[in-house]
């Protein structure tokens, strides 16, 4: 795949090299070249965001651009690539663009509080779209990615279609509850009772190699999207959520608040819905209409 809008590999946090995200060995590269486009993501690329923070992204497929943003504690690979969602979407003729949010994945993980102003993730999203020169595109995200999508829409983003996954109405309009939940998790690591939601979230944090200090900073970026702004979203919007997921409020209520919203329930809860094929299929079918 051709690199878009000058996106190149570059150094980043912790001694990132230009080879980060590339596979090693000629035999492996030959194998990748023989795979269908829809199963072979590009190497990780980087750009400097509005404040100079290096932000990583990957792409999969060719065609109409769709930007998909992952959830908190996660990254593009875990949320979109590992369980085949990006491949399903790319197979429908889409160029799936998947950033790692700041403090996540291969993006920079600054510890300076100044790196986490209100709506920083929103500004990163706008910066990525500008960097890639996108003018006709679709936009969506899972959980924190869906919240970031709502903030981008409230601050001028103009996608054709919108996806809110793992998200309910209260998760957009009342962010303080979730911020408090995650602040408790990150401030009491190693102390949560086994089997509780807090313990499960900490276990997920460990699997993704999350940086607790940087992730605490992310909580300072949260901003509510007023209900009036939600109701002003005029694009066709898919609200796709696990049938057992109420972590971010009611998904049916969110769909009802959107002028052109539709709700699709998939199997699972907030954590488990991501591993189910129905999530990617619902998004692919919606975008391909």
How would you name each of these model-derived features?
Residues 233, 239-241:
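Short beta-strand/loop motif that positions the catalytic acidic residue
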Residues 202-226:
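Hydrophobic, aromatic-rich cap/lid helix
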Residues 88-91, 98-137:
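Active-site loop/oxyanion-hole signature of alpha/beta-hydrolase fold enzymes
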Residues 269-280:
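Catalytic histidine-centered segment of alpha/beta-hydrolase-like enzymes
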Residues 147-190:
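Flexible "cap/lid" loop of the alpha/beta hydrolase fold
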Residues 241-269:
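Conserved loop-alpha-helix segment in the C-terminal half of the alpha/beta-hydrolase fold
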Residues 50-108:
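Conserved HGGG/HGGXW glycine-rich cap/lid loop of the alpha/beta-hydrolase fold
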Residues 139-141, 165:
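Short beta-strand immediately N-terminal to the catalytic nucleophile in serine-hydrolase-like folds
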């Amino acid at each position: 795949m051709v690199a878009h809008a000058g996106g190149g590999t570059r150094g980043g946090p912790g001694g990132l090299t230009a080879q980060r995200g590339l596979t090693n060995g000629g035999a492996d590269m030959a194998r990748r070249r023989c795979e269908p486009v829809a199963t072979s993501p590009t190497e990780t690329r980087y750009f400097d965001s509005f404040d100079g923070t290096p932000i990583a992204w990957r792409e999969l497929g060719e065609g109409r651009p769709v930007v998909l943003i992952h959830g908190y504690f996660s990254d593009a690979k875990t949320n979109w690539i590992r369980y085949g969602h990006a491949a399903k979407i790319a197979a429908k003729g889409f160029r799936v663009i998947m950033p790692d949010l700041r403090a996540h994945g291969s993006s920079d993980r600054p510890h300076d509080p100044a790196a986490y102003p209100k709506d920083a993730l929103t500004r990163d999203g706008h910066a990525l779209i500008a960097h890639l020169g996108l003018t006709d595109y679709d936009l969506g995200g899972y959980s924190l990615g869906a919240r970031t999508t709502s903030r981008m829409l409230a601050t001028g983003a103009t996608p054709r279609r919108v996806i809110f996954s793992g998200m309910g109405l209260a998760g957009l309009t009342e962010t303080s509850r979730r911020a408090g939940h995650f602040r408790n998790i990150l401030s009491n690591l190693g102390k949560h009772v086994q089997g509780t939601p807090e313990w499960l979230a900490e276990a997920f944090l460990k699997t993704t190699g999350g940086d607790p200090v940087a992730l605490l900073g992310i909580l300072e970026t949260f901003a509510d999207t007023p209900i009036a702004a939600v109701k002003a979203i005029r694009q066709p919007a898919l609200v796709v959520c696990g049938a057992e997921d109420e972590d971010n409020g009611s998904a049916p209520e969110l769909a009802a608040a959107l002028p052109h919203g539709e709700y699709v329930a998939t199997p699972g809860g907030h954590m488990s819905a991501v591993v189910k094929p129905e999530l990617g299929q619902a998004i692919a079918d919606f975008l391909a209409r």
